[in-house]
């Protein structure tokens, strides 16, 4: 972190002393057999829109520059119970409203692969931290791509879980009917492991779902033979960079060569997807913000 953070700016808050103290405590629990899980003692970076008791939670905004919550987000509590060591809070677009992490009050995060490029957003700091190997994994939040897009930009793996899988309690909302917390890591296995840990029913979140199956690791397969993979033609047309299209089709060909069944198909009404998204998105925070103001 000390080597690359000045260039990447992944974090808005680093808790070096707290992390070292926590690591010592967790190590004792590992040694006496109290903690045995795969995340025990593993450092994690938390997106700065998730409440952490006693640690600044700013949403990368000057408005919340001194805000220290009195409670911790449920997903973060689940990680702590598993022995995770919190390194700090990661940079993001202010209040998650962006897709480049350039709107942060604390300065833009940079893409570790090319400092002239953006890491994506709004969870750009979390993805950059994992890509720069400042943290082995991180938590982000996704409303309309805020985990998936920066994960793609930074060459890491990110998952937006099905709505209701991970408690939103303690997540500072953007669009409550769309927000979801999810993992960011180097590969799918790590993400599945983290997702198993943060998944839980939480009565404090009215949209939380009691899932019958949370063994995501067992759902992973070693090959794609016989797997049907669809490619929507609508997304391969106007506005798509030719290099991106070429990369998508090359990946599809590789999957096909490995035994997958790849089929192109048409989606209807694609041109209305983004307008519909924004209608849903901004009707959610508008009444809340009007009430608070």
Q: Model segments located where?
A:
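Glycine/threonine-rich beta-strand-loop-alpha-helix active-site module
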Residues: 143-169
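Charged, often glycine-rich, active-site loop that binds/positions anionic groups
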Residues: 107, 276-284
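Flexible, glycine/charged-enriched surface loops at secondary-structure junctions
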Residues: 10, 36-39, 203-209, 256-268
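Single conserved hydrophobic/aromatic residue that forms the stacking wall/gate
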Residues: 282-293
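Short acidic, glycine/serine/threonine-rich loops at helix termini
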Residues: 57, 97-101, 148-153, 171, ...
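A short helix-breaking turn/cap at a secondary-structure junction
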Residues: 160-247, 251
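Glycine-rich beta-alpha junction loops
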Residues: 48-50, 143-145, 198, 233-236, ...
